[in-house]
Amino acid sequence: MKKTLILAAAAALVSSTAFAQTPRAVDVKDIVELELLTHSEVTQKIKEGKTSVLLVTGGTEERGPHNVLGGHTIMSRHRAVEIAKRLGNALVAPILPIAVAATGVSEGTNTPGGLQVPADVFKGVQLAMIESISYSGFKDIYVMGDHGGGQAQIQEAVKEMDAKLSPKGVHVYYINDFYQKTHDDVDMYMYEHKLPIAGHGAMMETSEMLYEEPVPGMYVRPIYKTVPFNPTGQTPEQWKAARDARAARQAAMAAGNAPPAAAGGGRGQRGQDPNAPPRVDNGLTGDPRPSTKEIGKVVFEIGVNNTIAEIKKQTAQRRGSQD
């Protein structure tokens, strides 16, 4: 009798566990990714008011020994989905996983796996994506990229396609804050919290992917806590001075004045840190070791909020100019 009761209890436990693990059925109302919708579902969503679409470029390149190659694409997808959901009237086109000037792409590279296309080809792809998605019935197309390479071509393509499509009632926008302002704001957050600033595959990207990965180790390997890295070649104070100088130049130019002389350093222009350790050349620049999911959430929110703010600002300006 006792054995029978034990077996019955075990069977009940297995049954309840299996039931608890049964995945929840997909609710199409929650889906904003075009690639996960049928064409009839897209038609219905547009009728319901989702007349905006996000066209986002990610990228495939080395990000150090600890981060997966598709980091730009992964982060772009997570941010874009959240942006669309918060906007409430937008869908997300498939993320383009190839950009211009990917890091580590050269003959005989010791950091394999990267993909890139020439600038003119990339611009042509942007033009084609914008035009083809305009056929679907979207009224506002927001174009952006998470990779520095290709920003100029995205901007050029947006300008050309907006001029072509605006007479048809379709407007195209270049959302630079998805990339540039987000990097600047994240760098400032790191500076204010005395964390490592900037780099490639370092604090910003590692923390954000730790926050986004569905299971530990999928996007960021555990070795990030001990991995050797190349220094950025810049102290925090050198970074701050370069940032302030760049802001002063931008303000002067916006006011129509002659900009002050450029200072050394800044993102992409490194002042020299005389105490920097020797290079290890493993594809990683900057220190990722203090990265956490909590910092990643901050980075994620900065990117999402900056993008939403610029989308709303540009859309309001366009609507106002039409009144």
Predicted regions mapped to residue ranges:
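Bacterial N-terminal signal peptides that target proteins for export
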Residues: 1-7
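Bacterial N-terminal signal peptides
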Residues: 8-17
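Extended, histidine- and acidic-residue-enriched regions that form the cofactor-binding/catalytic faces
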Residues: 21-142, 146-323
